[in-house]
């Protein structure tokens, strides 16, 4: 159990049979009446965001999440197969369970799978990945690093904006948190 006074961004709680992550909180002490905590909560299973108010000191169950290191081994039709790095058990996940980060998932990549009981809540990719550019407009003599950017498609099918000097076949480092180009590899 966790007190509403201990809420911080990132804390996970259980409400109404779901897991919620505290996005924002505000402790309010009105001049008259008792204090309360106004929160913005995000459902980690479906992404819904709600605002909810708790009395100061009210206790709610804290969600116990388990982080497991897994490796993406292969893709089987619309299922992605992951192997637990400790037990070597295989787990199948759909692209809906992985979310929008599926565009950076490459075979052999190690990820953290966040579980609530036996239910997969989230797949955490590394902060950056190195992928090969398979399609982009050719670079033209005179293009500079400060010039601008152009779209490029990487080996997983994701499209990101890269500097004009990047050409097909180069390996680039990409930030998976904000889809940005970090540099050549």
UniProtKB/Swiss-Prot annotation:
Protein name per its UniProtKB record: Elongation factor P
Family from the record: Belongs to the elongation factor P family.
Pfam families linked: EFP, EFP_N, Elong-fact-P_C
Subcellular localization: Cytoplasm
UniProt xrefs under SMART domains: EFP (SM01185), Elong-fact-P_C (SM00841)
Domain of life: Bacteria
A molecular-function term among this protein's GO annotations: translation elongation factor activity
PANTHER family in the cross-refs: ELONGATION FACTOR P, ELONGATION FACTOR P (EF-P) FAMILY PROTEIN
Listed pathway(s): Protein biosynthesis; polypeptide chain elongation
PROSITE patterns assigned: EFP
Keyword terms of this UniProt record: Cytoplasm, Elongation factor, Protein biosynthesis
Signal peptide positions (record): none
Entry-linked HAMAP family: EF_P
GO BP, sorted A to Z: peptide biosynthetic process
UniProt function note: Involved in peptide bond synthesis. Stimulates efficient translation and peptide-bond synthesis on native or reconstituted 70S ribosomes in vitro. Probably functions indirectly by altering the affinity of the ribosome for aminoacyl-tRNA, thus increasing their reactivity as acceptors for peptidyl transferase.
GO terms for cellular component: cytoplasm
Lineage: Bacteria, Bacillati, Cyanobacteriota, Cyanophyceae, Oscillatoriophycideae
